[in-house]
Amino acid sequence: MKLIVGLGNPGAKYRFTRHNAGFMVVDRLAGAAGTTVNRRRCFSLVGEGRLNGVRVVLAKPQTYMNLSGLAVSALCRHYRLELADLLVICDDLDLEFGRIRLRPKGGSGGHRGLASIIAALGSSDFPRVRIGIGKAEDASAHVLGEFAPEDQSGLEEILSTAALAAACACREGLDEAMSRFNSWRLMSANGTAEV
């Protein structure tokens, strides 16, 4: 079993913000897994299903970003999962818009949701999918703002590709997913992409 956690903030106010890119990817994975992410468990909304034959738990913590570790550690305990069975999906200021990056482990990179998870788990040795949202002078306003109108045309392709990358990591392993998706980039405003 794999636990795929998309990071974000709960509530309609934050639904379409850059910081909720992880939630958006989990919503796309839910359709592919034949589930809905709407049951309350371990400070999260969860749904269970199968993704390419692999049993998955999809989760969206409801603790707000800075306390994501509370939910993730509770989920790992509840489902009795090892860190290798966890995949966290989040936004990344240090990655340009139109890029995704998978990593087997690493620091928080200043992402407070990741920092909370690392602190709660006592380890940074868990895989993650990072979705580039680009930098801005006011980082807080940027992550809590909605995607710019000029980014909307490519956003669906980015989120769908991140979902494919997560599914590939579950089915074929993280190394294969990194090989296949870390070089992917959205090529133009009309959503044309390359892998």
Swiss-Prot record:
It is an enzyme of class 3 (hydrolase). One of its GO terms (molecular function) is peptidyl-tRNA hydrolase activity. The active site is at residue 19. The record marks 91 as: Stabilizes the basic form of H active site to accept a proton. Its main location: cytoplasm. It comes from the Bacteria. Gene3D superfamilies: Peptidyl-tRNA hydrolase (3.40.50.1470). It is found in: Cytoplasm. One of its GO terms (biological process) is rescue of stalled ribosome. The record marks 9 as: Discriminates between blocked and unblocked aminoacyl-tRNA. The keyword Cytoplasm applies. Disulfide bonds: none annotated. GO terms for cellular component: cytoplasm. Keywords: Cytoplasm, Hydrolase, RNA-binding, tRNA-binding. It catalyses: an N-acyl-L-alpha-aminoacyl-tRNA + H2O = an N-acyl-L-amino acid + a tRNA + H(+). TRNA binds at residues 14, 64, 66. Hydrolyzes ribosome-free peptidyl-tRNAs (with 1 or more amino acids incorporated), which drop off the ribosome during protein synthesis, or as a result of ribosome stalling. Catalyzes the release of premature peptidyl moieties from peptidyl-tRNA molecules trapped in stalled 50S ribosomal subunits, and thus maintains levels of free tRNAs and 50S ribosomes. Monomer. Belongs to the PTH family. HAMAP family: Pept_tRNA_hydro_bact. This is Peptidyl-tRNA hydrolase. It comes from Desulforudis audaxviator (strain MP104C). The lineage of its organism: Bacteria, Bacillati, Bacillota, Clostridia, Thermoanaerobacterales. The gene is pth.
